[in-house]
Amino acid sequence: FSSRRRHTRLLTVTGVQTCALPISGEAYFREIESNVVLDLLETASGVISLGGGSILDQKVCAKIRELKEGNLVVFLDVSLNQASSRIGLNRDRPLLLNNPRAQWMNLMERRRPIYDSLASCTILTDNMKPNEVAEQILERIKHD
């Protein structure tokens, strides 16, 4: 599943949008997100693209570790400069308000060890086109 489809499912299941995060709070959003992600991890086949904060839930991490046996878990890494140009760190992203660059660095500092522990492999996606990233993943699948 792509991030867009996951997000659509989150909207369908809950009626909550990420822009509602400041109103409802991060804890509420993460609870809903975790439930949807766990459901997808249990029932979906194929590619599942998780949001960056999905791994903050211990149940999600445990399920990913369980599924890691026999599956490829890829951490698509990106530098701050590339992230900035891709997502526009100046946009209204609830967790990146008030000095978005520093907030992004703080989030990555906290999350990177989790990403690294869950990933079968890491691909630095800086300056790569989506098809190039896909080719790298396919190469990794062939060699596993």
Where are these regions (language model features)?
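Single conserved hydrophobic/aromatic residue that forms the stacking wall/gate
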Residues: 1-19
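ATP-dependent small-molecule kinase phosphotransfer cores
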Residues: 20-65, 93, 101, 105
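Short glycine-rich anion-binding loops that position phosphate/pyrophosphate groups of nucleotides
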Residues: 52-55, 79-81, 128
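Short amphipathic alpha-helical segments
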Residues: 59-62, 85-89, 135-136
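Conserved phosphate-donor/acceptor-positioning beta-strand/loop module used by diverse small-molecule
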Residues: 66-90
